[in-house]
Amino acid sequence: MKVLVYFQPSPKHDNFEGARMRKTIKGALEVIGQKYTSNLYDEYDVAHFMSPEDESKLAVPLERKVPIIVSALFGEDDPATRFLNHKNKGGKLIVTLKPKALRLLNKASLVLVPSESAKELLIENGVTSPIDIIVPGVNLARFNFSREDEKELFYRYFREDKNKKIVLAMGEYTNNMNGISSLINAAKKREDVEFYYIGYETFAANYGNCKRVIRSAPKNVHFKTILPDDIYRSMLLNADVFMLPGYSLSGIISVQEAMAANCQLIVRDSAVYSELLVNEKTAYIADNSETLTSLCLDYLDSKIKPTTEEAYNKISSYNLENFGHKLCELYNSLVTNK
């Protein structure tokens, strides 16, 4: 059996959650000796896609009657792998599937999602294809703390003081930047801590309220766009806190990597899958911005205990080998029953 693992965005988009998911899938298949290709026009027995932008590419395996798997809702921070639209209507966040995402998913032989709540969300939004739950694997070796050279990259790249604590936040640049106050208010009270906000730069980042937020933030808040993988990984290895201040669903890939890097997770409830994280056990989870700010400050002041050990133990069970075997079981089932 041979598998097509397909995700080929423009170079501008090929350095975020989609690229890391592709690397994870390929790594899992390599660990168990499963052959794969990235060439859409090669010969293969099953095709694995992960982006709504590739809807038109499904024509090739469909014409060949090759089973198609689509991984969905794992990389929602990445525009190239984002399946959802988020709109604020009357003060309430409305989440819907992108039209092209719905078309893609309903052409699939099988859809893979990371949690039961993700499955329910797809069904509520009109997905009729079979859906299975599988949590992506993590290459724990990429977050090995013995690699001092990798830890040093962050300090060389940003010229930071090694004695300062680091808070890393993941989000997006939107017109209103909902939730960003939880990060900024924490930074205002801890000038001795450096706060980094990482997100994919959009048109909104240069205009309106988003630009005002960035300009008015304290000097210890640094707004950055997506970084090269080695720099981002080094940042994770040095971060004391990984924060999700926004309301939109975040990418499970980024959350898993923060767990593997032993960062303390402080996240908004709506930004994560409830099945992955448990409040006060593997993360600190809150609904409102004031509580997120307080949790961040309390952790930095050692007033609340870390949940990093339990989070690392949980993420360790999602290793590449197990992920590879689960994928191959699904691939074989589709090939056998086509």
Question: Model-predicted segments: where are they?
Answer:
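Conserved donor-binding/catalytic core segment of Leloir-type glycosyltransferases
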Residues: 160-178, 184-188
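Membrane-proximal helix-turn-helix segments that form the acceptor-binding/catalytic region
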Residues: 76, 91-111
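A charged, aromatic-enriched C-terminal amphipathic alpha-helix characteristic of glycosyltransferases
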Residues: 17, 305-332
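Aromatic "clamp/platform" in nucleotide-sugar-dependent glycosyltransferases that forms part
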Residues: 247
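Nucleotide-activated donor-binding/catalytic signature segment of Leloir-type glycosyltransferases, i.e.
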Residues: 208-230
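Conserved acidic donor-binding segment of nucleotide-sugar-dependent glycosyltransferases
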Residues: 279-290, 297-303
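Short hydrophobic beta-strand element within catalytic cores of glycosyltransferases
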Residues: 264-267
